[in-house]
């Protein structure tokens, strides 16, 4: 241990502290930072391979409780013949798929309503060819849910509400009906 030394360091262009854990795949670190930026960094040299900026409007900060944070990415590849993709949620509620080799956007979907205090700060998960993502904003009174999107197309497969909606309207499930009784 006493012979260990710093191999390299990388300065992210953000004044906000980092809350994401990098993911490493084939010698590349993928990490998200504040304001919905994603970086691919060569793990051996520390050289930036690409940088993606979701270009979230600064005015969206007013719709969040806890600052312009982003807590991580997910990576997925169906097989060796398929493209490796990086997925993350943007502060303004989009779920975005990026080509892991080039940093180019493959697709983007608006996962949250644009007229409320919704955001996405959490990292997505990949399950059975679906990207699973939740929403943020519960601290500001929005309704929570978890959604699944097709990894290839971005088409929504399902949405599960975690809290009941308007008590004067039918709920999406028996469990939500029981929660109101």
Spans of model-derived segments:
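Surface-exposed, flexible loop/turn segments at secondary-structure boundaries
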Residues: 12, 37, 57, 81, ...
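Generic hydrophobic/packing signal
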Residues: 33, 42-45, 52-56, 77-79, ...
């Amino acid at each position: 241990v006493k012979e260990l030394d710093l191999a390299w360091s990388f300065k992210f262009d953000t004044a906000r502290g980092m809350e994401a854990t990098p993911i490493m795949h084939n010698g590349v670190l993928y990490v998200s930072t504040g304001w919905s930026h994603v970086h691919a960094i060569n793990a051996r040299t520390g050289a930036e391979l690409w940088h993606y900026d979701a270009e979230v409007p600064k005015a969206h900060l007013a719709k969040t409780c806890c600052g312009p944070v982003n807590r991580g990415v997910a990576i997925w590849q169906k097989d060796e013949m398929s493209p490796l993709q990086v997925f993350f949620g943007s502060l303004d509620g989009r779920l975005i798929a990026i080509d892991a080799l080039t940093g180019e956007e493959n697709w983007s979907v608006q996962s949250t309503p644009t007229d409320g205090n919704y955001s996405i700060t959490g990292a997505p998960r990949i399950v059975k060819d679906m990207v699973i993502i939740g929403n943020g904003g519960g601290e500001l009174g929005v309704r929570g849910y978890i959604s699944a999107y097709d990894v290839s197309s971005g088409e929504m497969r399902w949405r599960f509400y975690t809290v009941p909606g308007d008590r004067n309207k039918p709920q999406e499930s028996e469990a939500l009906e029981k929660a109101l009784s």
